[in-house]
């Protein structure tokens, strides 16, 4: 972009002005191409092509809102802007479904859990269905308690919830975890099991328990290429790790 500004990440006064953000198609294609070339994500989904539909506009609003909400945040242990993760999650979901509400919710999936914005904020802009999908992906962080101390109970609650969640919620969770594991694999190839030192849960066996339990509770999505990719990455990262009993 001109002057090295990121039209999604470097917004001034974003809460008031995010709706004014309209990069040109040429700028957008450059950004997408850079994501693909650097290996951050795969091919950008075809749904984002300019068609003027209400569904596309909803997705674009979700992208802009997520970028505004996550401004200034970075992925754990590196300098990658956090917005890369929800965008990658969104693109993975776009390969699973044509439902633009679900795709938009994927872009927003960490907003309630990790930013100042609430479900009521999202509901006013995106309506009930998208907000409910985002809320379904949001953990009770138990404010005021150390994250490491509450990690296990939060993950157990998350897994128990997703077992009976609608398939749309399960798709978002699968995409979220595929995106996380892709980043983990990249770090694992450089640092091995030391990668867990930057996380709230530093016990490799507990991390294996969670990621393998995710595979178990989402096994009804095994027909999706993303699920098979997830299994492949599980094997690489957690091969030989003794794992506690999985959530059934």
Regions picked out by a protein language model, each given a short descriptive name:
Residues 5-6, 10-248:
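Active-site helical microenvironments for divalent-metal-assisted chemistry
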């Amino acid at each position: 972009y001109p002057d090295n500004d990121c039209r999604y990440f470097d917004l001034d006064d974003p809460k008031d002005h995010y709706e004014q953000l309209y990069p040109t198609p040429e700028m957008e294609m450059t950004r997408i191409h850079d994501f693909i070339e650097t290996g951050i994500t795969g091919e950008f989904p075809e749904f984002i092509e300019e068609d003027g539909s209400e569904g596309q506009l909803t997705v674009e609003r979700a992208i802009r809102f997520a970028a505004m909400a996550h401004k200034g945040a970075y992925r754990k242990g590196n300098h990658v802007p956090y917005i890369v993760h929800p965008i990658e999650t969104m693109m993975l979901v776009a390969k699973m479904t044509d439902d633009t509400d679900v795709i938009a919710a994927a872009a927003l999936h960490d907003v309630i859990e990790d930013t100042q914005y609430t479900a009521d904020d999202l509901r006013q802009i995106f309506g009930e269905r998208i907000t409910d999908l985002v809320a379904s992906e949001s953990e009770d962080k138990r404010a005021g308690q150390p994250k490491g101390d509450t990690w296990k109970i939060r993950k157990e609650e998350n897994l128990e919830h997703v077992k009976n969640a609608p398939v749309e919620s399960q798709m978002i969770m699968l995409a979220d975890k595929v995106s996380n594991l892709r980043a983990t694999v990249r770090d694992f190839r450089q640092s091995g099991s030391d990668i867990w030192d930057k996380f709230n849960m530093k016990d490799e066996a507990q991390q294996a328990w969670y990621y393998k339990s995710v595979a178990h509770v989402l096994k009804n999505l095994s027909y999706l290429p993303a699920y098979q990719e997830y299994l492949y990455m599980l094997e690489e990262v957690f091969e030989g790790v003794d794992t506690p009993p999985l959530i059934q």
